[in-house]
């Protein structure tokens, strides 16, 4: 009896020991497998899991706001919906295209082309209008397209004043990139940065437990800047009204106006006609996108005579009371140069030459200065090189090489021909005369601020150089005042 109990005890001990060995072996295998998965395949499996249940979404912080000098908003960013399709889950492409096309104003074939591209994601229409979004959302629910049609939130640039300041502001493309004007010139500051965020999605790749909208609403960007311009929207409005009136009354090909504070170099208004609405820039010819104040060069004509008079007075080749004989026209190197009236003014002083803008007198003054000095003074007043204003596409203008100039070139340059300038260059030069002969760098950006309101950069007055002596400038200003008081400018 005792032997049977002993045998049974030994048998149990052996089986228990065997089970312990087996369980220990299994546990060891599990530990080894766990270690293998963690240490060897862990990164790959983790990435596989992330790809199965979500994706990394790039969030672009909304562009900074652009305002005028008084805080009036001129360019802002609004949240909008963008439409996409998952071609892998489209069961009837023709039906979907037929239903979508009239709601988003797109040809059915274009939508079919998007679907045929395949894959799990394709944009159909970016940054829809609100009524478009509401119409599509309703249709998607009613016709059960939720498996293949979805929306994502994106920022859309909006210009609340429509055409006002359009050629200065520019516009933004589909991918939030500035394509003209300040939007392009300061794109790196306005655009801010892109931030990656992981979103958990459902089987149709739609975000769950979070949304792109809430992510973008919370994420304001750490580096995008707001820009305050030197423009005064009130002055800008008056200028553009007058340009529209001039276009209607005179029917010119184009017209440009620049208003500048000569004591600071701040541009208070800058406008061109024809122009466009940056909210729908794609409806206009690219030619009207250009800011003619900085990108268009032309012969300045009699307006350049102020610079010639400044040079002549500074170099003392003339004095206000010096006498000239005006025959009505002069011949220079075989070229006839005559007065605007086509008549002779007889014996006149240099003051009269300036007051009446006599081409014959200025041609003689130009020849007295000579090609080198005439060109040197043009450069002193900023002609021949870009001003450096914060706008893209600025032209530098055209100046003759003095060594290549004939007498006729010198004479015609003295009356504002044989030279090409931008409207901004001309206004900058005239502002120097109004500023005691000191040339300032024009600027259209007043302040750049961070998202928290702190100052990132504050623009101020930048003195470039003195063009003529103060005494000379005072004499010149006295002559120019007579032009508008009793001379040719009175008209």
Indicate where each model-derived feature is located.
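Beta-lactam-recognizing serine transpeptidase/beta-lactamase-like catalytic domain environment
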Residues: 3, 75, 202-218, 255-302, ...
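Periplasmic/cell-envelope proteins involved in peptidoglycan metabolism and beta-lactam response
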Residues: 1-281, 372-384, 488
